[in-house]
């Protein structure tokens, strides 16, 4: 009896135009003009898209990692000193994380919560000086846009109906 009830509920919810189906959950949302009136146009769709994006990243993480490595290799073959600066920055971040909180004087305290982002920022600034900014951001744009589009366009339960 419960299976029949679930199937009927699923069919009725899928026929309703204001419902969004996630993996096994059906979420009823207000009509679009209600959200426009409230100023929340994109809210009802984001929590429905999130499980799908997460599943696509989990399924295709090798693909995204390979794409990222290819773009970085392309970038660092042409600008090896930028790779050296990145390696030094990553090494310094690991050292700062390994040392933890350091107190040099009573007034000077190095907390990893603040020092590691500082090391990362200095590393990125050095990389930008060693390599043309256009090339660096071209690699970032290729990876992020391709991975994001692939993750959104992959056909796995399109619950939000945005594509």
Curated annotation (Swiss-Prot):
Membrane topology according to the record: Multi-pass membrane protein
A GO BP annotation: meiotic cell cycle
One GO cellular component, as annotated: Golgi apparatus
Compartments reported by the entry: Membrane
Query: Which residues are listed as membrane-spanning?
Result: 61-78, 82-104, 114-134, 136-156
Which terms are listed as keywords in the entry? Meiosis, Membrane, Transmembrane, Transmembrane helix
Gene Ontology molecular function terms on file: small GTPase binding
User: Does Protein transport appear among the keywords?
Assistant: no
Purpose: Has a role in meiosis.
Q: What is this protein called?
A: Meiotically up-regulated gene 109 protein
> Origin organism of this chain?
Schizosaccharomyces pombe (strain 972 / ATCC 24843) (Fission yeast)
